[in-house]
């Protein structure tokens, strides 16, 4: 009887530590959870997670996608929800009133230290601290030494030129040792496929 009690207690503690499941509603948490969490820990992701241009090798192929709306999130109130609190303050307040565990991920790490702190935080939440620490160590050890004339970078998506002055993109460029291309592009549609396939008719 005593052995059974000890086993049950250990099983409960193990489940409590690693049984937490997550709903990701931001691109940042989509990417980092795909890197740090076990597949069974991720129950739903944002619509960004289906976009290979944003997710690269971490595209969501088998999880439902959710919009940041209360009705869509009601079935997931027992999960830990990652959401951009700055964009959806009212939704965050409503979720907290309903007892949901909300973790703000504002998608705007301004510095390397903020990015590394976020990675370590998610590593702790997912129970994967060792991998998170290794990832941070790897990023810190990178030595990006590019020729200065070649560091100007134009970022494109499938809908046009990416505004590289946004904080999240600035942090990425800084991490890679790159600088935004300073050319007077207009806000016209500039899809990447037109650059890669200039001779194709549209």
Model-derived features: positions:
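Hydrophobic packing residues within well-ordered alpha-helices of enzyme cores
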Residues: 32-33, 91, 95, 169
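Alpha-helical, coiled-coil/dimerization segments enriched in small aliphatic residues
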Residues: 47-51, 59-60, 163-188
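Sec-dependent signal peptide recognition
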Residues: 1-10
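Extracytoplasmic substrate-binding proteins
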Residues: 20-21, 91-161, 179-184, 189-191, ...
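N-terminal signal peptide c-region/cleavage motif recognized by signal peptidases
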Residues: 14-17
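A short, structured surface patch at a secondary-structure boundary
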Residues: 21-85, 198
